[in-house]
Amino acid sequence: MKKIILAAAVVAAFTGSHAYAEDAAPAAKPDNETSFNAAVVSDYRYRGISQTRLQPALQGGFDYTNNPTGFYAGTWLSTIKWTKDAGGSGDIEWDLYAGKRGQVSEAVSYDAGVLAYVYPSNGLDNVTGFVDANTVEIYGQLGYGPAYVKYSHAVTNLFGFVDSKHSGYLDIGANIDAGEGYTVNLHAGHQEVKHNDAASYTDWKVGVTKDFGVVTGALAVIGTNAGKTAYASPANGKFLGKTALQLMVSKTF
């Protein structure tokens, strides 16, 4: 349930008949930008929990940004298994989101928006112990250099949990440029499921991303302290929040 946004820096080199070298000048961004992204991942983890029963997923999306205002919107899809495993149906997660990002100051950035997680024909509202899996969250984020803190608040029930409206997720992390196309990814988060302490937990990730030019590769170790009863797969009993290695290959067009 986590959309992929791979940011690209646009740089233009100035050339001419000068007998001396000049610094490259960054090109002005166009008013409107669009991009597509696609990925294959060894295990789709969202907030530390496997959405695919510890198996691979195919993912892709589209993003639009209006640079003068900072407004953006997009959509993203992934294959999943958890809704069907829980007794419902469907094998797709479809996310729709919109928001606004910008700078509070030269050093501090912000991002605020709304995100809808749609699970077409999930049918969990017909399964005892669940409600409709479709979820809407509003979120706000502040960034300082490579570090950020983000809070997401559910304005509906959360991912099929009964009476879970107003659940919240706190996300703290940093994406540190290590040079040569490498980025170190650090994350810690806490999911509070309203009225359900057994389903609340903390997750973490330590990873590295490498831009190979043609594609981007990411390798991460992901884990949680989630309850094994609350997050065991109904299909085979496997714990969906166990510590594991995740590999992703992605491409932005």
Language model region names:
Residues 206, 210-215, 221, 239-253:
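Outer-membrane beta-barrel "beta-signal"
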